[in-house]
Every structure is written in structure tokens, then in C-alpha cells.
Swiss-Prot record:
Domain of life: Bacteria
Segments forming domain Glutamine amidotransferase type-1: 9-202
Keywords (A to Z) from UniProt: ATP-binding, Glutamine amidotransferase, GMP biosynthesis, Ligase, Nucleotide-binding, Purine biosynthesis
Pathway entry: Purine metabolism; GMP biosynthesis; GMP from XMP (L-Gln route): step 1/1
UniProt source species: Rhizobium leguminosarum bv. trifolii (strain WSM2304)
Protein name: GMP synthase [glutamine-hydrolyzing]
Role of this protein: Catalyzes the synthesis of GMP from XMP.
Domain GMPS ATP-PPase: from-to ranges: 203-395
Length: 520
């Protein structure tokens, strides 16, 4: 059995909760490496990772239903500290001899926890007699504790809201400490990791960088690697890491589909060629892409055309180079986590980047994915470690299909150029106002609508530009950014005055849900 090279790590057993990734985020924020494994393969994951502690996640399942998920017995036989969250608490109790019943009073949302007794997990945080806000989301509840456990905190609807077996270092909570609505939740998880499990928390991007470089060198040897460089943070960090490991054995290919932001392709090429000495091939395929996209209005059809053309173009350029044995990709950890079905086997849903999906199979190449253990914020930290400037690392997310999905309806070179100029002015105003880093994502959209206007003494009939800006933590939910009207007026005036083809500007005040961040 191959063991993962992380001597101080935490195993998270996933029972299908929608917020399991947040548990991993909290553990990583505490400076400790962790992995999420579905309950069906948790024993294999345990043996491979050799963790110092185990966390059991929540689940939409009910512990009282026949065939509901269970933790592998090795978790409890190992003598390691265990932290059960919501469903994780319930299955731990049942497996150790306690009882769980379907609750008559379901508890969802904010609740208040009354601490009845001091415990090691509360050290430096909570004390007996105090009250704290937590976030509940459960129907079942524990009704009888296993031997060795005691209640340390309760809520109005959960008499076993926080239980502990201090001798065996088993802890169970009915609430969700991983969500931001439990203000002290991250600290509780940190206490479990550091104080209870005795893990130092010295996992760093510097250590990850060296480990990744060593692994790339071992995997690649003296063979060649090609990497699809989009200009985004993920592919850029992956390319720099691979280049650090194998140097000139790496060739990067930037397929310029003509759908990037103003001057973006030129800036990316200049940065990587001049500052990082990467062997970078810049392929101008804009005529090919825009030619096939012209007149196509369905957004999904646009995406499919762009994905197909990217694969074809990349494949052709790679063949001109004589091929390669390995393909470098900026795959992140959320892309490779298995989605867990608690009623059956795990259904693996690996999201392929729109423009590299299918390439390894078609070109018979092995994947090099040096970021596959990292979350997005960790990739940014690694980028800083590698010397990428904050101005690049902190850029707003940009979709793979580019401006094609910010131009609803049919596209043309003329429309793309209008949109490119409007978007550049909008982002320039945001930066001048010092708002760029406070906004998750901001962009302009060129609507397939023309309106009547008056400019000078003449009548105009030109396009409408919509401005979009949102705040978000992870992109899963988002709220529109609350600009002051003076800023919006200034940005709109510049766009109308400086961009020929636009005579009206509107601001999108839709949150996600019900809307999405992008328009298509």
C-alpha cells in the first residue's frame, strides 16, 4: 500500500454532506494537511494516509435507516482522536453502543449552545456556564450515550449537542463547526487538531512546493511535458511549478481564441517569456474560433464549439512540436473529490477544464497535476511562493469560454471589440476607486439589445452594456456589490463617451441564487 507523504495529517470521512469541503478548508487553515475520502473507501484511505486524527462529516442520510453509511471500524480500533460532526456524531454513537432516534423537533439554522461542563476541546475558548451561537441542521438526534461519554453542552432541542469521551479523545457535536455561522467553529476544529491530536500545524506552501517539485521530477524523469497555459492563476502556477522541476523539458502552449480581455494574451506572453524564461508558444487561432462561433446564440453550443476547437488546435500544435509524454494541468482538489451517494457507490464527478478535457486520452499522454491537492486560496499562496505578483494572483476569475459567454446571443469581431473596450474601462474605474480587491468578480456584458439614444444633435441606435460585480467567499453563492451611485455614473459616462457602439449602461443587481454570476 502506497502511503501519502504527509506524516501529520487528518482524514475526513465523507458521508455526503454538502459542506464537507468546508471541514477540509478549516483543517488546512489550521496549517494541517487533510484529505476527504468517501465512506465507502475510507478504510483504504486510512491505511494509505496514516492520519493522526479522523473527522466524520455530516450527511443527508438518517442513521436510523437500514443501510445508512457507517465509519470503518478501523477508525475506532486505531486509538486515534475522532471528531464526529452532526451525522458523524450520530453514527459514532450508534457504532459505539449508543442510541439515535428520528427527532420530533427538527433543528435548522441558528441555535445557542449552553456549556455545562469544561472539556479539553474548549481550552482557551469556552468555559462552563457560557453560551455560544452555533449552526444546526439535523432531524435525528442522540438519545443515549455510549459508555465513557458525557454531555458537555446542550441546546434547547439537542440535549446531546456536544458530547465527549475525554479518555479516548472522542468528541461529537450536533451542530456544524465548519460553517461561518458558527463563529467559534474554526477554533474548535483547530483545538481538536492541535490540542487533542497534538498536530503542530506546520504544513506550508514552501514545504508543498518542494514536495511537488520532487514528485514531478520523479514522475517525468527526462521526458517532455506540454502544458496548456490559459493565462489564469491555476494553469500559470502549475506551469511555473513544472518548469521549476524540469526546466526546458516543459513547453507551454497558449491558444489565443480571440475571446480574452483587452491585451491579456500579450501581457501573459510577455510575463512568462521575459520574467520566467518559459518556452511558450503563442498560437493566434482567433479567426478559427470566431469564424465558427459567429451567429451561434445558444450558450451551451458556444461552450462545446470552444472546447472542441481548443482540443483540435492544441493537438495540432503539440504534434508540430513532436509530441510529449506528459500533459500538465492545473487541476485543483475540488475537481477530484468524489461526490458521495449515501444510497449506493460513489459517483466520481471529475470536472474537466473546458479546453483540456479529452486531451490525455486522444494524445496518449500521462497527466501531471501538481495542484490536485490544493484549494483555490492555497494555489494563490503557492503562486506568491513562486514569485507571481499579487496583481496577477489576485485577478478576478475569468471563464474558459471567455468573452463569448459575456456577449449573449450571436457574437462577431465587432461585438467582441466593443465589449473588450467597455470591460477594460469598467475594470480601470474599479481599480482607480480602490475597489478591485473588495469585489469577487466584476465584468461588462454586451447585451443583444439596441436602444435609441441622443449624442450631440444626432439620434443613435446602439447596444446596451450591463455591468456586473459580486461579492462572494467561494463563488457558490454571491451578492451584487453595492456601489455608490457616483461610481456607477462615472463608469457609465466613460463607457458611453469612449466606446463607439454603446449608448446605454445598466447595472445588474441579481444575487446568486436565483441568478448565476455569469450571464451565460
Amino acid at each position: 500500500m502506497t502511503q501519502t507523504a504527509h506524516p501529520d495529517s487528518v482524514l475526513i470521512v465523507d458521508f455526503g454532506s454538502q459542506v464537507t469541503q468546508l471541514i477540509a478548508r478549516r483543517v488546512r487553515e489550521a496549517g494541517v494537511y487533510c484529505e476527504i475520502v468517501p465512506f465507502q473507501s475510507a478504510e483504504e484511505g486510512f491505511n494509505r494516509l496514516q492520519p493522526k486524527a479522523v473527522i466524520l462529516s455530516g450527511s443527508p442520510a438518517s442513521t436510523v435507516d437500514e443501510g445508512s453509511p457507517r465509519a470503518p471500524q478501523i477508525v475506532f480500533d486505531s486509538g486515534l482522536p475522532v471528531f464526529g460532526i452532526c451525522y458523524g456524531q450520530q453514527t459514532m454513537c450508534m457504532q459505539l453502543g449508543g442510541k439515535v432516534e428520528s427527532g420530533h423537533h427538527r433543528e435548522f439554522g441558528r441555535a445557542f449552545l449552553d456549556v455545562d461542563k469544561d472539556c479539553q476541546l474548549f481550552e482557551g475558548l469556552w468555559s462552563s456556564g457560557s453560551r455560544h451561537q452555533v449552526w444546526m441542521s439535523h432531524g435525528d438526534r442522540v438519545t443515549a450515550l455510549p459508555d465513557g461519554f458525557e454531555v458537555v453542552a446542550t441546546s434547547s432541542n439537542a440535549p446531546y449537542a456536544f458530547i465527549a469521551d475525554e479518555k479516548r479523545k472522542y468528541y461529537g457535536v450536533q451542530f456544524h463547526p465548519e460553517v461561518v455561522h458558527t463563529p467559534d467553529g474554526a477554533k474548535l476544529i483547530g483545538n481538536f487538531i492541535h490540542n487533542i491530536a497534538g498536530i503542530k500545524g506546520d504544513w506550508s506552501m514552501s514545504a508543498y512546493r518542494q514536495k511537488a517539485v520532487d514528485e514531478i521530477r520523479k514522475q517525468v524523469g527526462d521526458k517532455r511535458v506540454i502544458c496548456a497555459l490559459s493565462g489564469g492563476v491555476d494553469s500559470s502556477v502549475a506551469a511555473l511549478l513544472i518548469h521549476e522541476a524540469v526546466g526546458d523539458q516543459l513547453t507551454c502552449i497558449l491558444v489565443d481564441h480571440g475571446l480574452m480581455r483587452k491585451d491579456e494574451a500579450a501581457n501573459v506572453v510577455a510575463m512568462f517569456r521575459e520574467h520566467y524564461n518559459l518556452h511558450l508558444l503563442h498560437v493566434d487561432a482567433s479567426d478559427r474560433f470566431i469564424g465558427e462561433l459567429e451567429g451561434v446564440s445558444d450558450p451551451e453550443t458556444k461552450r462545446k464549439i470552444i472546447g472542441r476547437l481548443f482540443i483540435e488546435t492544441f493537438e495540432e500544435e503539440a504534434k508540430k512540436l513532436g509530441g510529449a509524454d506528459f500533459l500538465g494541468q492545473g487541476t485543483l482538489y475540488p475537481d477530484v473529490i468524489e461526490s458521495v451517494s449515501f444510497t449506493g457507490g460513489p459517483s466520481v464527478t471529475i470536472k474537466s477544464h473546458h479546453n483540456v478535457g479529452g486531451l490525455p486520452e486522444r494524445m496518449k499522454m500521462q497527466l501531471v497535476e501538481p495542484l490536485r491537492e490544493l484549494f483555490k486560496d492555497e494555489v494563490r499562496a503557492l503562486g506568491r511562493e513562486l514569485g507571481l505578483p499579487d496583481s496577477f494572483i489576485g485577478r478576478h476569475p475569468f471563464p474558459g469560454p471567455g468573452l463569448a459567454i459575456r456577449c449573449p446571443g450571436g457574437i462577431s469581431r465587432e461585438k467582441l471589440e466593443i465589449l473588450r473596450e467597455a470591460d477594460a474601462i469598467y475594470l480601470d474605474e474599479i481599480r482607480k476607486a480602490g475597489l478591485y480587491d473588495a469585489i469577487w468578480q466584476a465584468f461588462a456584458v454586451l447585451l443583444p439589445v439596441q436602444t435609441v439614444g441622443v449624442m450631440g444633435d444626432g439620434r443613435t441606435y446602439e447596444f446596451v452594456c450591463a455591468l456586473r460585480a459580486v461579492t462572494s467567499v467561494d463563488g457558490m453563492t454571491a451578492d451584487f456589490y453595492h456601489y455608490d451611485m457616483e461610481f456607477l455614473g462615472r463608469a457609465a459616462t466613460r463607457i458611453i463617451n469612449e466606446v463607439r457602439g454603446i449608448n446605454r449602461v445598466v447595472y445588474d443587481v441579481t444575487s446568486k441564487p436565483p441568478g448565476t454570476i455569469e450571464w451565460e
